[in-house]
Amino acid sequence: MPHFLILNGPNVNRLGSREPEVFGRQTLTDIETDLFQFAEALHIQLTFFQSNHEGDLIDAIHEAEEQYSGIVLNPGALSHYSYAIRDAVSSISLPVVEVHLSNLYAREEFRHQSVIAPVAKGQIVGLGAEGYKLAVRYLLSQQGGESR
């Protein structure tokens, strides 16, 4: 059974209260609950991890290679400057899809650059929580199709 890691970075735990005009009112728990139901329908497993600490995210990326079929990564603002996360992603053989709830390219200029995107399989931005599902569907398609 395909098993994917949903990895969320700094401030994603503040969803629902942080800039709801940008990120919406769904909490991270709401999103995880919805994704859990989505995974059940596809007969796949998802594991969720969120940290506000760069090193914890790097450790999770390194450890993922032994446990998962791919990673959906929302690095938050770390996407703009974390060469350490970029290096962690490029050091593993798992496919990684970068996801952002908001459209980075419609926000402040400094958000228009991701140092992670060039080493990820792809990037999904601006589609809200639906972006996670699209990323999972892509990763699943790379496993030889949808389960069952």
Swiss-Prot record:
Q: Which cysteines are joined by disulfide bonds?
A: none
Q: Name one GO molecular function term.
A: 3-dehydroquinate dehydratase activity
Q: Which Pfam families match?
A: DHquinase_II
Which pathway does it take part in?
Metabolic intermediate biosynthesis; chorismate biosynthesis; chorismate from D-erythrose 4-phosphate and phosphoenolpyruvate: step 3/7
Q: Which UniProt keywords apply?
A: Amino-acid biosynthesis, Aromatic amino acid biosynthesis, Lyase
Which residues are the active-site ones?
A: H100 (proton donor)
Which residues bear the site annotation Transition state stabilizer? R18
Q: Keyword Transmembrane helix on this protein?
A: no
InterPro entries, alphabetically?
A: DHquinase_II, DHquinase_II_CS, DHquinase_II_sf
- GO biological process per UniProt: amino acid biosynthetic process; aromatic amino acid family biosynthetic process; chorismate biosynthetic process; quinate catabolic process
- TM ranges are none
Annotated residues that bind substrate are located at: N74, H80, D87, L101, S102, R111
**Reaction catalysed?**
3-dehydroquinate = 3-dehydroshikimate + H2O
Taking the record's annotation, the residue ranges forming a coiled coil are: none
Q: Which Enzyme Commission number(s) are on file for it?
A: 4.2.1.10
Annotated HAMAP family:
AroQ
**Similarity section:** Belongs to the type-II 3-dehydroquinase family.
The record's subunit annotation is: Homododecamer.
What NCBIfam families does the record point to?
aroQ, PRK05395.1-2, PRK05395.1-3, PRK05395.1-4
Q: Per its record, how is this protein called by name?
A: 3-dehydroquinate dehydratase
Q: What is the lineage of its organism?
A: Bacteria, Bacillati, Bacillota, Bacilli, Bacillales
